[in-house]
């Protein structure tokens, strides 16, 4: 693999990414569990417990499965409109990209003081076919994911939780389906994929129309 813009090979950048994820986990005292343990405890995670999905490299902590909790339903095959609010945080310092560990890169959650950011959630159409999940953003407003990252493709890492959550329609910030994720570059945004860096997310999932 040829060297990237910063003079490192892709393999070296992947090693740096893995080191950054490991350091983030240690600094936040996360407990990492296997998929087997996750299934053995009925796809529930404890407060500071993250399950590692080996195939994707995504780490997930479920904060709330949805407004009806375990009595809700996972999404069935077909198309669904999903509304998400999120915060995207750098897990790795990258001088050439002008961000450091812990920097907020993009968000539309919480009191930001920017009405354009706060007013609209991310809207995307989720398609489930057998075990395949794909999604496309439906809007490209200023400061939206599609606008900032130049693609309507929803990061694959965002879709991993939807196999386990039971989202509904709610205006309650306490009952909305919500997760925390650590997403490696291959499951992240187009920019993360291009420059090989991981991100931490907190994301909510609400059903649209």
Q: What kind of feature is each model-predicted range?
A:
Residues 3-209:
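Cross-family detector of peptidyl-prolyl cis-trans isomerase
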């Amino acid at each position: 693999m040829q060297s990237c813009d910063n003079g490192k090979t892709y393999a070296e950048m992947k090693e740096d990414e893995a080191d950054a994820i490991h350091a983030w986990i240690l600094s936040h005292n996360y407990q990492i569990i296997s998929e087997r343990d996750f299934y053995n405890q009925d796809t529930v995670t404890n407060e500071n417990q993250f399950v590692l999905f080996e195939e994707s490299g995504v780490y997930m902590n479920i904060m709330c499965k949805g407004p009806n909790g375990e009595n809700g339903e996972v999404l069935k095959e077909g198309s669904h409109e999903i509304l998400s609010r999120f915060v995207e945080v750098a897990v790795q310092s990258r001088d050439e990209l002008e961000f450091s560990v812990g920097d907020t890169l993009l968000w539309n959650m919480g009191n930001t003081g920017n009405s354009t950011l706060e007013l609209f959630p991310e809207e995307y159409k989720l398609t489930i076919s057998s075990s395949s999940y794909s999604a496309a953003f439906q809007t490209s407003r200023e400061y939206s994911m599609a606008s900032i990252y130049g693609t309507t493709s929803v990061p694959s890492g965002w879709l991993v939780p939807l196999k386990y959550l039971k989202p509904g329609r709610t205006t309650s910030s306490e009952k909305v389906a919500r997760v925390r994720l650590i997403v490696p570059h291959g499951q992240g945004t187009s920019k993360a994929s291009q420059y090989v860096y991981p991100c931490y997310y907190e994301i909510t999932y609400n059903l649209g129309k």
